[in-house]
């Protein structure tokens, strides 16, 4: 929204010279010796300059993008290896195929982080930027929807009680994700060597659709899960959505969905900010929300590892003796 232009610093004398004194105008007389008050038009133009706002995620933040990408790829790859490792106890996690897809989504996000990072000069092209935004938001949408399904289905994921889950759920979720990413894919590109969404009247409908999608998935979805959990518990209708450590994921994206929606309202003139300071605060919140969203690619594999460790530690001792004999851990021990 705001720009990072050099803002002229006005001295008190300059500020006073840019305003007409009402008393001087009242006492003004049209004598030959009188002259019109001098107005500093340069100062007036400087005062009317756009609101000054510099981005936190500028060229100097490139190491942050690179570090987050590297750590995210490493952590996601490790979790995927442990989930697909033959005869390993993490395959006892309820719905471990869904967990594997979460790790894949986190890895995809980590891969495209450097593409959208500032400070890479003029290496960006519009096609590459559009692809980057497509994968960026597509992986985030997919992870949010997978978490919603994982919370709603709960332990049924590991009991084979959901027919068609193995193929139907991934196809449906990733297909919906592809549709949700179309607006930002078409409304993004490269500008001055930076990947950025394109704001124009022709693309306003696409930007509105993207803002609504982010608000619904990142803000309303977790609120709906919490509301359903509390309502079912209050009415005694059952346990409700399965609450676990994976819900922490929404903390990294909830601010982004909220602030992005507010920024669209301001940019489309549907809501006006009263002062320049309010605009600067909004720009700062946008940068902080984006940085927090980037950190999720490192946190998600850690959350998955913690969840698998907790569930397998509590699940394995509770299994009946014949099932424990056929579990991957015991099979691995017998082979060794």
Curated annotation (Swiss-Prot):
Where in or outside the cell is it found? Early endosome; Recycling endosome; Membrane
Q: Could you tell me the superkingdom of the organism this chain comes from? A: Eukaryota
**GO BP field:** chemokine-mediated signaling pathway; inflammatory response; regulation of chemokine production
- Paired cysteines (S-S): 51-276, 129-195
Instruction: Specify where it is mainly localized.
Output: other
Which stretches face the Cytoplasmic side? 85-95, 154-166, 229-244, 309-336
Q: Name one GO cellular component term.
A: recycling endosome
- Which residues are tagged as glycosylated in the record? 16, 27, 33, 58
Q: Which residues lie on this side of the membrane: Extracellular?
A: 1-63, 117-129, 188-207, 266-287
* Record's keyword terms, sorted: Disulfide bond, Endosome, G-protein coupled receptor, Glycoprotein, Membrane, Receptor, Transducer, Transmembrane, Transmembrane helix
Q: Which residues cross the membrane?
A: 64-84, 96-116, 130-153, 167-187, 208-228, 245-265, 288-308
Name the membrane topology term.
Multi-pass membrane protein
For this protein, the record's InterPro entries field holds: Duffy_chemokine_rcpt
Q: Which GO terms describe its molecular function?
A: C-C chemokine binding; G protein-coupled receptor activity
Similarity comment text for this entry = Belongs to the G-protein coupled receptor 1 family. Atypical chemokine receptor subfamily.
Q: What does this protein do?
A: Atypical chemokine receptor that controls chemokine levels and localization via high-affinity chemokine binding that is uncoupled from classic ligand-driven signal transduction cascades, resulting instead in chemokine sequestration, degradation, or transcytosis. Also known as interceptor (internalizing receptor) or chemokine-scavenging receptor or chemokine decoy receptor. Has a promiscuous chemokine-binding profile, interacting with inflammatory chemokines of both the CXC and the CC subfamilies but not with homeostatic chemokines.
Provide the protein name: Atypical chemokine receptor 1
Native species: Saimiri boliviensis boliviensis
Which taxonomic lineage is given here?
A: Eukaryota, Metazoa, Chordata, Craniata, Vertebrata
Annotated gene: ACKR1
